[in-house]
Amino acid sequence: MEIKSAEFVISNTDVRKCPEGNKPEYAFIGRSNVGKSSLINMLTNKKGLAMTSQTPGKTLLINHFLINNEWYLVDLPGYGFAQRGKENREQLKRIIENYILDREQLTNLFVLLDCRHEAQKIDLEFMEWLGESGVPFSIIFTKIDKISKGRLKENLKVYTDKLLETWEELPPIFLSSSEKKEGRDEILDYIESINNSLNN
């Protein structure tokens, strides 16, 4: 897929205020500092489209970007940042859950995982909840340029083995590096294949 245009449309905390219409939406979510904004900028080839921050948990809004005037890329708030207050965490949880469960246009949710770390309980529980809720999702392992190929292979095996303890089959999995633009074509082609199937 060639990205010809990518433009910011709206930020909000209320799923009812998301764009109207029936364009498919592909949302991206992950723990704070997983590299989500950098990945979005890499996918769209627009360096400043999604704001990157050195401060974990900075993104508190649902951000919609219109791609090629055909589909929306949705940047969801990061989850699991411990320094947020309890009230703030509960508010974020509601924002995320309301979008994921109530947004009919949500076509696929990309769950971002930092490949440098072992399987985290919060990520596994989140994906378990997605499965129980019938939400279609895929996994993107980020920052693959930050560790050796051997370590990457080892970490992926541990992660997939952990998932297969409760899953009959694995969701689609992608490997990415925002700095080296690895995984870009595979992720965009996957989105394009879903869009094509929706149009047929």
Curated annotation (Swiss-Prot):
MF (Gene Ontology): GTP binding; metal ion binding
Species of origin: Parabacteroides distasonis (strain ATCC 8503 / DSM 20701 / CIP 104284 / JCM 5825 / NCTC 11152)
GO biological process, one term: division septum assembly
UniProt cross-references to NCBIfam families, sorted A to Z: GTPase_YsxC
Ranges where the EngB-type G domain occurs: 22-197
Record has Metal-binding as a keyword: yes
Name of the coding gene: engB
Keywords: Cell cycle, Cell division, GTP-binding, Magnesium, Metal-binding, Nucleotide-binding, Septation
InterPro entries: G_ENGB_dom, GTP-bd, GTP-bd_ribosome_bio_YsxC, P-loop_NTPase
Protein's recorded name: Probable GTP-binding protein EngB
